[in-house]
Amino acid sequence: MSQGILIFQAIVTIACIAFVLAAGIQKSNRLSKLMLIVAFLCLIENAAYLMEIQADSISAILLIMKLRYIGVAFIDTFFLLFCMRYTHKKIPKHLVGVMLVVDILVMISAWTSQYHSLFYRDIYYVTAGSLTYLHRVYGPVIYFNSVYETVQIFACAYLALKGWREA
């Protein structure tokens, strides 16, 4: 089973590379640039996750997780900005600033997770039969970020449906 997950993640990473290349070739306007940023952030997250599931120590996994959060922290914000631009909706600049500050704080929290329990409360290996996996006890920043990203994704879906209705 773990080999299947590894193959699937490799395919997703290759698809992200292709998407970044395709977005980079497109005519350069602000919408294309936003989509290229989203694609690049997805590539960072998926490539890091591919490395994470192959890592064999907690220290390696934590290092790769920090790399992964460069993508994770910003994907939803830039996708929301893309959806706003695509549907010709205005977003106040101060709101964009607040969203980017939240993303930066989440990323900093991930990068400094070894010094506090706001991101992960505990991390340890668990063996269940022949399967060994890493168990993570999440801290409040992970839960906050999950709710924050969910709100952003619902906003993207709302904008897409509203744009589709108006078309």
PLM-predicted stretches and their roles:
Residues 123-140:
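Juxtamembrane membrane-water interface segments that cap and precede transmembrane helices
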Residues 138, 160-167:
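Membrane-helix boundary/juxtamembrane motif in polytopic membrane proteins
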Residues 155-159:
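Membrane-water interface of transmembrane alpha-helices
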Residues 2-15, 28-118, 138-151:
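Individual alpha-helical transmembrane segments in multi-pass integral membrane proteins
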Residues 18-27, 83, 161-163:
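C-terminal ends of transmembrane helices
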